[in-house]
Amino acid sequence: MYYITLNINYLWRKCDIYSMVHSHFMVLLSVLKMRRTEKMNDIFEKNHPMKDDKKFITSYWSDRARDFGSLRAKELESPKLKLWRDELMSHIFDSDRSLRILDIGCGAGFFSIILSELGHTVHGIDITPNMIEEAKQLAQSLDSDATFSVMDAENLSFDTNTFDIVVARNVTWNLPHPDKAYAEWLRVIRPGGLILNYDAEHARNHHNLPQSVHHAHEHVSNELKERCHTIYHMLDISSFTRPQWDIELLTKMGASSVSIDSTVGPRIYAEEDEFYIPVPMFLVKAIK
């Protein structure tokens, strides 16, 4: 009986020790989990700044502005100039008269300069101040009459029915609220006015580009490519099926006609050079 009691007491003490160790271990584990969660949240906030998407996007393009401007200057002196000029002219109505054209997300002013040289009144806007400076300098060097200003593509300061045409190239994929942007673009063009939106899902494919391919992004640093990929992950538009989504949205918004041209990429970028876009480009064309 004494032996049994002793063993029971021994076991109880063992249980108390186990319980105490287990309790301390669980507290320690909880603290470690909490710290790990805080660390992961810090990393996520740093790389996926959901609270201020536009600031992050603007910072990315600001850091790319100088090299981007240099590449656009070269493109304006390359065979791509004629290809893009012919492409734009094939869609522009009343080409014999001067039209009021808004270049959305104009970057270094590539479309603005081309359309201005065709005799149209063109204003380019971009949310990134450094890009607008590049556009102004490039336009001045080419004696272009195109004008530029810093403005948000989702919140235009122009009156309703101001423009005949809105053009955009490689813009919509990195807009936090593309539905608001489309609504604004439709608002500022006159009835019967035209939207020409050239776009592609650039960020989705940054990690999948063959190393041997000669393309427009091959000299972009890995750090900038990662930031570009972050933009893709933090924006809702990246999960949309495009350009079908664009068609459905513009139709719901009251566009009288919406069409898609998926052959623009192969036509403009038929060969791999420093301007080559290795992801499928498409045109969303809408009439108000």
Where are each of the predicted segments found?
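Conserved class I S-adenosyl-L-methionine
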Residues: 35, 40-97, 110, 114, ...
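C-terminal alpha-helical "lid/dimerization" subdomain adjacent to the S-adenosyl-L-methionine
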Residues: 55, 72, 200-270
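Class I SAM-dependent methyltransferase SAM/SAH-binding core
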Residues: 102-104, 108-155
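A short acidic, Gly/Pro-enriched loop at the edge of an enzyme's catalytic core
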Residues: 154-165
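A short SAM/SAH-binding and catalytic strip from SAM-dependent methyltransferases
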Residues: 165-178
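A short glycine-rich, Lys/Arg-flanked "PGG" loop and its adjoining helix->strand segment in the class I
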Residues: 179-191
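Conserved beta-strand signature within the Rossmann-like core of class I S-adenosyl-L-methionine
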Residues: 193-200
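Core SAM-dependent methyltransferase catalytic element
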Residues: 253, 270-288
